[in-house]
UniProtKB/Swiss-Prot annotation:
GO terms for molecular function: metal ion binding; nucleotide binding; nucleotidyltransferase activity. Mg(2+) binds at E73, E75. The keyword Ligase does not apply. The lineage of its organism: Eukaryota, Metazoa, Chordata, Craniata, Vertebrata. One of its GO terms (cellular component) is nucleus. This is Putative nucleotidyltransferase MAB21L1.
Length: 359
């Protein structure tokens, strides 16, 4: 048993050093290329409208606010200033979303975003995004990369297609630190020892973001209140949870396997599903020793089996907001197909670790 475990870990490490690292290097190169173009577009936007200041800064070889969705798809979160005169309200009526309401006694004119406040005093995510989209469209025509970048049509999101190869969504957002949403108040679960009080305090201090984007839990039937709502996002908090042991290595393996074998019709699976399932696996295996290097194979198999179960049940709950289903709106046939493909992959890795050389 131990020999089989060690063999699997050996082949996974080999796969990580060869395939995962080359994937990372290729994506880093793409990110540099993409961020040059996006920075140039955002510089033009800022000239036209100084309230939209580019926050796409490089720190320690990372671009702040950039998320990799897949090797050709990225999201850049553009942090806006001065949320201060608004109250953050998440009463659970819109899963995964919250609203920003003008604080009592505050005048509209005190807000930097005065013309985006609705009659009932809400700061409208849709109105801000609509204005931003117009500015980006103008900037694309003026910027020095105008030959290689164009707007993606037929969407209310702000998306750029670069060199006909990459798609980048630019999402206006507010950073919320020092508060924690009510809809995530159940976390951490009292009976689970992970991640421990110190890490919990760090995660909550990271806070969350409010994004101006279509909320997929609302799926097409948006009332005006819903289109004014902001989408909750916990990227920094989630990253902090995955520090230590082989957690990040495990996620890197899953992303690489997804990119190579689970990029399927209907796009049922993305990297965020993988990140979510690693967090759930941490709860199931709360001891640090469960994430030692020699447990890598067990953890990876556990996550792949959990993924198959989620696909078969057609439900993958968001880690911090379990009422939000990350498979919402995905075609059932695509989820079924993904379950079959994931099962084939898991069986192959488990029964014949050497097959990783070909995967």
């Amino acid at each position: 048993m131990i020999a089989a475990q060690a063999k699997l870990v050996y082949h996974l490490n080999k796969y990580y050093n060869e395939k995962c690292q080359s994937r990372k290097a290729a994506i880093s190169k793409t990110i540099r290329e993409v961020c040059k173009v996006v920075s140039d577009v955002l510089k033009e936007v800022e000239v036209q409208e100084p309230r939209f200041i580019s926050s796409l800064n490089e720190m320690d070889n990372r671009f702040e606010g950039l998320e990799v969705i897949s090797p050709t798809e990225f999201e850049v979160v553009l942090y806006l200033n001065q949320m201060g005169v608004f109250n953050f309200v998440d009463d659970g009526s819109l899963p995964g979303c919250a609203v920003l309401k003008l604080s009592d006694g505050r005048k509209r004119s005190m807000s930097l975003w005065v013309e985006f406040i609705t009659a009932s005093g809400y700061l409208s995510a849709r109105k801000i995004r609509s204005r931003f989209q117009t500015l980006v469209a103008q900037a694309v025509d003026k910027c020095s990369y105008r030959d290689v970048v164009k707007m993606v049509a037929d969407t209310s999101e702000v998306k750029l297609r670069i060199r006909d190869r990459y798609v980048v969504q630019i999402t206006p957002a507010f950073k919320c630190t020092g508060i924690w949403p009510r809809s995530a108040a159940h976390w951490p679960l009292p009976h689970i020892p992970w991640p421990g009080p110190n890490r919990v305090a760090e995660v909550k201090a990271e806070g969350f973001n409010l994004l101006s984007k279509e909320c997929y839990s609302l799926n097409g039937k948006q009332s005006s209140a819903e289109s004014d709502a902001w989408v909750l996002q916990f990227a920094e908090a989630e990253n902090r949870l995955l520090l230590g042991g082989c957690r990040k290595k495990c996620l890197s393996l899953l992303k690489t396997l997804r990119d190579r074998h689970l990029e399927l019709p209907g796009q049922p699976l993305n990297n965020y599903h993988m990140k979510t399932l690693v967090s759930y696996e941490c709860e199931k295996h709360p001891r640090e020793s469960d994430w030692d290097e020699n447990c890598l194979g067990d953890r990876l198999n556990g996550i792949l089996l959990q993924l198959i179960s989620c696909l078969q049940c057609r439900r993958c709950p968001h880690y911090f907001l379990p009422n939000l289903d990350l498979f919402q709106g995905k075609p059932h046939s695509a989820l079924e197909n993904a379950a079959k493909q994931t099962w084939r992959l898991a069986r192959e890795i488990l029964t014949n670790p050497k097959s990783l050389e070909k995967l």
